[in-house]
Amino acid sequence: MTPRSYCVVGGGISGLTSAYRLRQAVGDDATITLFEPADRLGGVLRTEHIGGQPMDLGAEAFVLRRPEMPALLAELGLSDRQLASTGARPLIYSQQRLHPLPPQTVVGIPSSAGSMAGLVDDATLARIDAEAARPFTWQVGSDPAVADLVADRFGDQVVARSVDPLLSGVYAGSAATIGLRAAAPSVAAALDRGATSVTDAVRQALPPGSGGPVFGALDGGYQVLLDGLVRRSRVHWVRARVVQLERGWVLRDETGGRWQADAVILAVPAPRLARLVDGIAPRTHAAARQIVSASSAVVALAVPGGTAFPHCSGVLVAGDESPHAKAITLSSRKWGQRGDVALLRLSFGRFGDEPALTASDDQLLAWAADDLVTVFGVAVDPVDVRVRRWIEAMPQYGPGHADVVAELRAGLPPTLAVAGSYLDGIGVPACVGAAGRAVTSVIEALDAQVAR
């Protein structure tokens, strides 16, 4: 039988994982071609050397309780490169001062008034305390915006000072743009099971306290993972953009190249997906157009190692506060300091407020310096700096997002699959999982064709 040919469009973590999983599934004889027009692979995973130390300037951590990343690292022989966070906790900047991250919450949604003490006023604390006694109606399967549910049950202060900072850090969005089932699926599930109030649902959803670290990273940065995936997938990398996809799986690139494939995986952002499948998969095209994304910018700094930052992993900024940054990560506190410099990064940009698109590098650096004075009272003299922009890289998981994704996938023809951060979660583990699902889909479709 003639060896099969596979094409993967997109060279980020989703595309590289898809290529690796394909190679695992189909063996050495098949041809796997990966299209990525950028001068590097990895997408929003980008490791650079700042102050002589490797630092991730895109995604920088993964949740350890999810199995995908530890399993993938083990397959690639990289388990010994996995790092765990030091245990330093983030703070919230609200009301012009720093507060501990509220305990016993799920994405900032409280399980009791005590978890919000010091962060919200007494009237809001009383409202949280009385929430369980107030009438509450929940429709099984519903997916409200987080802000709508939380503001109704607890008031605007809980949204602005507790929930928004966490969701802004994860999605570059807000409680108004993210649906409950994406942000807090365990809370939605508890409500579906019959929880009688939101505080009751949060208590049911709280994960058991393991005492262990929550986040992981890689010694040497995500580049270590990218190199491993490229090496093991043995792809043919075409540095060109695919501009047209035709049935029978003919791909045309921007140079005029024409490529034939038995199966295709589109590991591109939703807007590009919509353009590529227009005329091929109308349901998928329509669903993909419903998914919007935010842009962000990261300012990375290396400062002298003795700079007097507080002992925390960083700061999440409430949306109604004066700092321009949405989050500050004290990377050397979070992962442990190496060498004689301390590394930190400031993230800018929320959905609807996107300085990544408008501010100059000099403006972002000036904002970073001002924000460090405002939040920490520390004026820094960086020894190295870097600015990176991530344009439309943060999909917004709005209300009903899971239904949109289900429709998007249902409209795909056999032997065409999708992978990406807009599908099953924005984090790296979710991207790894979605890539595996895409590969399984096209392999099963090809096997079914042979069986017929």
Swiss-Prot record:
Catalytic activities: coproporphyrinogen III + 3 O2 = coproporphyrin III + 3 H2O2
One Pfam family in the UniProt entry: Amino_oxidase
Cofactor field: FAD
Pathway in which this enzyme or protein is active: Porphyrin-containing compound metabolism; protoheme biosynthesis
EC category name: oxidoreductase
GO terms for MF: oxidoreductase activity; oxygen-dependent protoporphyrinogen oxidase activity
Positions contributing to FAD binding: 10-15, 36-37, 58-61, 242, 390, 426-428
A biological process term (GO) from this entry: heme biosynthetic process
EC number of the protein: 1.3.3.15
Cofactor comment: Binds 1 FAD per subunit.
Keywords: Cytoplasm, FAD, Flavoprotein, Heme biosynthesis, Oxidoreductase
A single Gene Ontology CC term: cytoplasm
SUPFAM superfamilies with a match to the protein in the record: FAD-linked reductases, C-terminal domain (SSF54373), FAD/NAD(P)-binding domain (SSF51905)
InterPro entries, alphabetized: Amino_oxidase, FAD/NAD-bd_sf, Protoporphyrinogen_oxidase, Zeta_carotene_desat/Oxidored
Localization per record: Cytoplasm
Keyword tRNA-binding: no
Origin superkingdom: Bacteria
Protein family: Belongs to the protoporphyrinogen/coproporphyrinogen oxidase family. Coproporphyrinogen III oxidase subfamily.
PANTHER family linked to this entry: PROTOPORPHYRINOGEN OXIDASE
Protein name: Coproporphyrinogen III oxidase
